[in-house]
Amino acid sequence: MSKNRRLFTSESVTEGHPDKICDQISDSILDEILKKDPNARVACETSVTTGLVLVSGEITTSTYVDIPKTVRQTIKEIGYTRAKYGFDAETCAVLTSIDEQSADIAMGVDQALEAREGTMSDEEIEAIGAGDQGLMFGYACNETKELMPLPISLAHKLARRLSEVRKEDILPYLRPDGKTQVTVEYDENNKPVRIDAIVISTQHHPEITLEQIQRNIKEHVINPVVPEELIDEETKYFINPTGRFVIGGPQGDAGLTGRKIIVDTYGGYARHGGGAFSGKDATKVDRSAAYAARYVAKNIVAAELADSCEVQLAYAIGVAQPVSISINTFGSGKASEEKLIEVVRNNFDLRPAGIIKMLDLRRPIYKQTAAYGHFGRHDVDLPWERTDKAEQLRKEALGE
């Protein structure tokens, strides 16, 4: 590798990874509540370990959801259906500890500061202030057709394929837990030129040999997913590099909601504000504003106003308007960043109520995001992945 080239690595995990089990359970509960009560306030956390699921958090709703039933159904869909896996949908214990949302927080969210002080009408802001303070990032770049960085894009596709070959009985000896990792080499112009390394670790039946796993994973998982032109004789493969991965899932490691925030976003290629997504309704700006920031960044790149774009939004609890908007195009912008911020303010309502309305976030759409990434998805219709504002942004930014 020449001195002007660099390597960058991102990872993903399968739906059977312990932390991802928790994300999916939390978002399944959120979706079940939103089906019946779109205005519910939900902050749902899940923890799993051998034979045990604990669901806790703060939920304010007018409806009833059978949480243990939802938990078991989600675990069953993932594929933990036999006790010998160390975790089984039918026999695991499910404990719940749910409180209502704090009245102090609800006061700020129910009626935003601007409305309480009379500077904006309730109708205008739909009486929703930010559910917490914090900062959120969104990112897009033109490395892939989904406008995502190549390393995380490939890592997600490999993880999804790993689950597909298990569920479709192409490789029936695989079990639900698994991880993928892709290292991409970039040239001096910051363009991806080749794959330097691929790492795949997959849980498996104890009687399958390492040689068979390595051969099958390369044939049925890597080759159908990774573009042939990015592979060369120096590409390195690490398939189950420890030699054995039989004990996995919650039996191998305890899991928690919100512990895969880099997998959920951009694989470390862009910055992260620290807030997790799963189990949170859209009044939580950790989730909704991160989606809005991606929506903004993706439309800027789709409009060819920049090759890459990172958007930061920041909020104060109980205040509807973002306290700051920042845009970084890393020197690739066709318009100044000040101009881009002006155009963004004109075309995107970044108040929590505005985001919810703009992206229609009171729907049960969240479980499908809880594995294989919240961004760059073409297998599901996610409103923040649309590029419907690109043409208008370009027109305003460049005066076309």
UniProtKB/Swiss-Prot annotation:
Subcellular locations according to the entry: Cytoplasm
Keywords linked to the UniProt accession: ATP-binding, Cytoplasm, Magnesium, Metal-binding, Nucleotide-binding, One-carbon metabolism, Potassium, Transferase
Cofactor requirements of the protein: Mg(2+); K(+)
Positions bound to L-methionine: 58, 101, 253, 284
Superkingdom to which the source organism belongs: Bacteria
A biological-process GO annotation: one-carbon metabolic process
SUPFAM superfamilies the UniProt entry points to: S-adenosylmethionine synthetase
UniProt binding sites for K(+): 45
CDD domains xref list: S-AdoMet_synt
E.C. no: 2.5.1.6
Note on cofactor: Binds 2 divalent ions per subunit.
GO molecular function: ATP binding; magnesium ion binding; methionine adenosyltransferase activity
Key word Metal-binding present: yes
Principal location listed in the UniProt entry: cytoplasm
Chain positions covered by the region annotation Flexible loop: 101-111
Residues binding Mg(2+), per UniProt: 19
Protein purpose: Catalyzes the formation of S-adenosylmethionine (AdoMet) from methionine and ATP. The overall synthetic reaction is composed of two sequential steps, AdoMet formation and the subsequent tripolyphosphate hydrolysis which occurs prior to release of AdoMet from the enzyme.
Self-association state and partner proteins as the record states: Homotetramer; dimer of dimers.
HAMAP family: S_AdoMet_synth1
Name recorded for this polypeptide: S-adenosylmethionine synthase
Record lineage: Bacteria, Bacillati, Bacillota, Bacilli, Bacillales
Gene assigned in the entry: metK
